[in-house]
Amino acid sequence: MTRNHPQPSRRTVLGSAAAAAFTLVTGTGTARATGPRAGWPEDFPLPDGWLPEGITIGARPYAYFGSRANGGVYRADLRTGEGRVLYEGAAGLASIGLKLDRDGLLYVAGGGGGTARVVDARTGGLVATHRLTAATGHFVNDVVLLGDRAWFTDSREAVLYGVPRGRRGTVRALPLTGDWEQLPDVNNANGVVGTPDGRGLIVVKSTPGELYRVDLRTGRATRIALSGAEDVVNGDGLLRLGRTLYVVQNRLNKVTVFELDPGVTKATLRRTITDPRFDVPTTAARFGDRLYLVNARFTSPQTPETTFSAVAVPL
């Protein structure tokens, strides 16, 4: 079920074809006009008690952070580190992974609520709410924009959800088959990105720490062989730049960087990024020559007084 809200979607005005083509051309769906300059902060605070997990950055120097506490969205200026709450959320909502498209629409994974929401990044207005699955027994975790759909992972069910990025179409549930074996009572599918050719998806399975290539026509998941690393356990957010894949391993406080082979059958470890400022980083986004990560601090008390931050490291 989809509920459309009063705020009009700019995608329905501009049409989905241009934005879909943009995503396929760039591979990451994000343009970079200028990069960070000297003096831009390398870390900055988020609101106390925000309980962040997801981050997304578009062509302009603004980062957007979802809240597990109330489903809100916070926008921070990368030039100053200052920000404001863009979307207030509401009691009982959660915002986990999120992605910003070219038209200024935020696609937001709703966690245990089983929904996906679309928020106008300019006004903070709620554009649409999509019911993906039941509100119990599921966890809608992360999202990637690919072609004319936003694809969401479900950590508790072997299925992906394709939400149409326009006025027409229905939500598509794509069961994962092939090499995929769903494990009970743990987080399975987590971070997701498109393949370099734009025809499929790469999904990280947090437990036991594996990467998969998914065929969007059939749902067949093929395990990607790792070279130089035994696993990517606690794999959370993914970022792909060309054939370079960044895997955020949250509780291990590191980002592992792999090179993908042309067929996306093998991932070779090239380096590991660590930083003393990491405090259970969950997801990452790029702006210029920096990688911005959000510290979810899962190992600390999650209270209204808990402090949170975002940090930047060189790519």
Q: Model-predicted segments: where are they?
A:
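Conserved beta-strand positions in repeat-built beta-propeller and related beta-rich domains
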Residues: Y64-A69, L106-G113, W151-E157, T195-P196, ...
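Blade-level signature of beta-propeller repeat domains, shared across WD40, Kelch, NHL, RCC1
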Residues: R290-L315
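Short loop/turn segments that connect beta-strands within beta-propeller blades
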Residues: D77-G81, A121-G124, R165-R167, D215-G219, ...
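Hydrophobic alpha-helical segments and helix pairs
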Residues: G124-A173
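A short beta-strand motif characteristic of beta-propeller blades
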Residues: W40-P45, E82-E88, V127-L132, R172-L174, ...
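N-terminal secretory signal peptides
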Residues: M1-P8, A19-T26, R32
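C-terminal segment of N-terminal export signals and the immediately downstream linker at the start
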Residues: G27-P45, G54-T56
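Beta-rich, blade/repeat-based domains predominating
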Residues: P47-A63, A90-L106, T133-W151, D179-G200, ...
